From Swiss-Prot:
Amino-acid positions noted as binding UDP-alpha-D-glucose in the UniProt annotation, renumbered to this chain: Q358, H373, W376, N377, S378, E381, D397, Q398
GO biological process, any: saponin metabolic process
General function of this protein: The monoglucosylated hederagenin 3-O-beta-D-glucoside is a feeding deterrent of the yellow-striped flea beetle (Phyllotreta nemorum).
This enzyme's EC code(s): 2.4.1.368
SUPFAM superfamilies in alphabetical order: UDP-Glycosyltransferase/glycogen phosphorylase
Keyword Cell cycle applies: no
Listed name of the protein: UDP-glycosyltransferase 73C10
Catalytic activity: oleanolate + UDP-alpha-D-glucose = oleanolate 3-O-beta-D-glucoside + UDP + H(+)
Record-annotated active site: H24, D129
One Gene Ontology MF term: UDP-glucosyltransferase activity
Higher taxonomy: Eukaryota, Viridiplantae, Streptophyta, Embryophyta, Tracheophyta
Binding-site list for an anthocyanidin: H24, G396
Keywords noted in UniProt: Glycosyltransferase, Transferase
Pfam families membership: UDPGT (PF00201)
Length: 495
């Protein structure tokens, strides 16, 4: 066992740097716990507000004896021209704050350097989010290997790798509507230029920030990926080859959450009582409920949210609808009451205004479908729970994840969204799927057609394989062992 080797020969000390966004921090905290369970000393470096978000989960982990500590560094907001109170990416109210936010983040280099000079034992390895390129300078200065965490799947990472190597593909497209085929891929997959998370034109200061991230990616020792070999074998192998063998699939990391409290409190505290939510689910038939959640930074226009609501109503199926960023959606709240929507669906629709205990909901036997924005955390949690997916991608890696889910894995149905909804530009897009489209897609996913039955069968199988992957002897469990052995060799005092 690596945990025994770790203690007896040379104590490993990993320093983790999560990016300050909910979807990035959640898996990084899970990774911290997985490594600590193997006897690795873990130090998480983050800001006070972000540390508070995970206080309960980490306190339980520390009380159970796991060697985890948190070091807080103050974000230099004022010096970077960032208004106070914008310590997390998902709290930014305007795209104009993006550049000052990343400036503030990269200014953490100096205080973090001082921390490293005083750390004991000396760190053996850094695990850093892709969005924190300054950690490469720390790794170089202290001669420590840096492992990168992107928060994406191997399908998406390999797609980006191929397109970076063949930039002319995107550059030669005549318009943003034109489709292209990704070359050298195991499956035939088509995208438009905006659908891939690889910007061909980025203005001014934002371009420099992006280039720093790409450069830091190239110089990292390796990459850990929150996926499992059995889910996307051809893409996991292809990406590992692209990284000269230094890529480890260690997921689904969410499966380290064994107890109800940990499942319910990943990230922000849920805005619904856990028991109330489970009681509501218990009252529904097996596989009958559609769970609807479009992510932590989704703010679709009111016109689209109305169509989504009316489509859910007309589907005649029970549903849970999570509306996050609730304070931004006051008009929707008014529409719920004034139009009579909330009253009409009260017997079969549960509206959660804020944060939901997503893992608990997806694991419940009455849930038979998940309408998702295809963020990788949500996508993987759905598959791991054996729940078929109804895909509604918005931006970033989400169209890549949709292609994997619908075309390659065949565990979901597309809602029909083809156009990218960039953050801050939602109103320009308007309605992409009307109520009839929503109703049709729900029926396609949750009906009794042969295709729907096949999707349900396939996702159940992949869910079972996910649980096997993280058990002792499973692919992800073995990959963590391999990673630790690799770092242990590098960390020996005579190296």
């Amino acid at each position: 066992m690596v945990s025994e080797i770790t203690h007896k020969s040379y104590p490993l000390h990993f320093v983790l740097f999560p990016f300050m966004a909910q979807g990035h921090m959640i898996p990084m905290v899970d990774i911290a716990r997985l490594l600590a369970q193997r006897g690795v000393k873990i130090t998480i470096v983050t800001t006070p507000h972000n540390a508070a978000r995970f206080e309960n989960v980490l306190s339980r982990a520390i009380e159970s004896g796991l060697p985890i500590s948190i070091v807080q560094v103050k974000l230099p907001s004022q010096e970077a021209g960032l208004p106070e109170g914008n310590e997390t990416f998902d709290s930014l109210v305007s795209t104009k704050l993006l550049v000052p936010f990343f400036k503030a983040v990269n200014m953490l280099e100096e205080p973090v350097q001082k921390l490293f000079e005083e750390m004991s034992p000396q760190p053996s390895c850094i695990i850093s989010d892709f969005c924190l390129p300054y950690t490469s300078k720390i790794a170089k200065k202290f001669n420590i290997p840096k492992i990168l965490f992107h928060g994406m799947c191997c399908f998406c990472l390999l797609c980006m790798h191929v397109l970076r190597k063949n930039r002319e593909i995107l550059e030669n497209l005549k318009s943003d509507k034109e489709h292209f085929v990704v070359p050298y891929f195991p499956d035939r997959v088509e995208f438009t230029r905006p659908q891939v998370p690889l910007a061909t034109y980025v203005p001014g200061e934002w371009h420099e920030i992006k280039e720093d991230m790409v450069e830091a990616d190239k110089t990292s020792y390796g990459v850990i990926v929150n996926t499992y070999q059995e889910l996307e074998p051809a893409y996991a192998n292809g990406y590992k080859e692209a990284r000269s063998g230094k890529a480890w699939t260690i997921g689904p990391v969410s499966l380290c959450n064994k107890v109800g409290a940990d499942k319910a409190e990943r990230g922000n505290k849920a805005d619904i009582d856990q028991d109330e939510c489970l009681k509501w689910l218990d009252s529904k038939e097996e596989g009958s409920v559609l769970y609807v959640c479009l992510g932590s930074i989704c703010s679709l226009p009111l016109s689209q949210l109305k169509e989504l609501g009316l489509g859910l109503e007309e589907s005649q199926r029970p549903f849970i609808w999570v509306v996050r960023g609730w304070e931004k959606n006051k008009e929707l709240l008014e529409w719920f009451s004034e139009s009579g929507f909330e009253e009409r669906v009260k017997d079969r629709g549960l509206l959660i205004k804020g944060w939901s205990p997503q893992m608990l909901i997806l694991a419940h036997h009455s849930v038979g479908g998940f309408l998702t924005h295809c963020g990788w955390n949500s996508t993987l949690e759905g598959i791991t729970s054996g729940v078929p997916l109804l895909t509604w991608p918005l931006f970033g890696d989400q169209f890549c994840n949709q292609k994997l889910v619908v075309q390659v894995l065949k565990v979901g149905v597309s809602a029909g969204v083809e156009e990218v909804t960039n953050w801050g530009e939602e109103e320009k897009i308007g309605v992409l799927v009307d109520k009839e489209g929503v109703k049709k897609a729900v029926e396609e996913l949750m009906g009794e057609s042969d295709d729907a039955k096949e999707i349900r069968k396939r996702v159940k199988e992949l869910g079972q394989l996910a649980h096997k992957a993280v058990e002792e002897g499973g692919s992800s469990h073995s990959n963590i062992t391999s990673l630790l052995e690799d770092i242990m060799q590098l960390a020996q005092p005579n190296n």
